[in-house]
Amino acid sequence: MLIGQIEIRSMKIIDLHCYPNTEPWIKSQGPYVEALAKYWNRAWTAKSEAEVIADLNQAGVEAMLVAFDIETITGAPPCTNEYVAKMRDDHPGVIRQAWAAVDPLKGERAIADAKKAIRDLKLFGFHFHPIMGHFSVDERKFYPLWETINELKVPVMIDVGTTGMGAGMPGGLGAVIRHAHPAAIDQLAADFPDLKIVAAHPGWPWTDEMLAVALHKGNVSWELSGWAPKYFPDAIKRDIKGRLKDKIMFGSDYPSIPYDRIFKEWNELGYSDELMEKIFHGNAERILGLEVQSSCS
């Protein structure tokens, strides 16, 4: 399969947004599993760790694994930081690093978990899912957590836009999509200018607002996972090759959309090989320091 004119397996691909897709991850989603199966129109079931690694190997990606913790809201056991750290250590040729997860609603416990994730487990940074976690990142009560993360000098990846979690269910299972409005990232970026923030997903229905934030805030970059590339809005397609060519990065949201489809549709967007190299690894290496990052750093 080609990306531009480059054989995909000859090009480095850093997948910034990759879930474990094993039983601990499925269980961590609690009541949202049924809604996800309906949203993606397929079974939402776990694979073995060996099967997941085989998927990533076949795709030729260097995965950034994502932990998951929304325990306060759902009571579901987290897909823990220890778990993704072990997967990283067990599969160094496939899993480049891993994003930690802490539940902001846990207060001081979240701060302690954050320190442990970086200092002891040597994880890369933190991922947050505001809709499922029932919080907005610009709420002042969570600022002690952001101050801690800022002091740890690691990046955060924050979901923007609507989600399949709870979609179509009565009341969305209590999830509120405004929690993932790009305006919250705009405020957080302004209040913590040294914090590197990666916005995750295109941000629909607020793609124009997310474009504005990415253009305005120097410490905000953007990965476009969880969305079939052929459905990217025209404004995003233009700015990928224009004003945001040095800020857009690749993520899959595995296991949401098959890698073959994602790569095929990125290829069909018709971008130059030089731009694709930036999107699929160069920007992540430069912005996030991944060219020197390792699991032992």
Language model features with spans:
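Mid-to-C-terminal alpha-helical segments outside catalytic/metal-binding sites
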Residues: 2, 6-62, 242-249, 257-297
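Conserved, mostly hydrophobic/aromatic
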Residues: 17, 56, 84, 126, ...
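A cross-domain feature marking catalytic cores of carbohydrate-active enzymes
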Residues: 18, 65-68, 100-104, 127-130, ...
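Active-site environment of divalent metal-dependent phosphoester hydrolases
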Residues: 21-24, 71-73, 104-108, 162-166, ...
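Short aromatic-enriched loop/helix-cap "lid" or pocket-rim segments at secondary-structure transitions
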Residues: 24-30, 77-78, 111-113, 168-171, ...
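A general structural detector for well-ordered alpha-helical segments in enzyme core domains, enriched
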Residues: 51-55, 80-88, 113-117, 141-145, ...
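Active-site gating/metal-coordination segments in enzymes
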Residues: 62, 71-167, 176
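Catalytic pocket-lining loop regions of alpha/beta-barrel enzymes
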Residues: 123-125, 138-249, 296
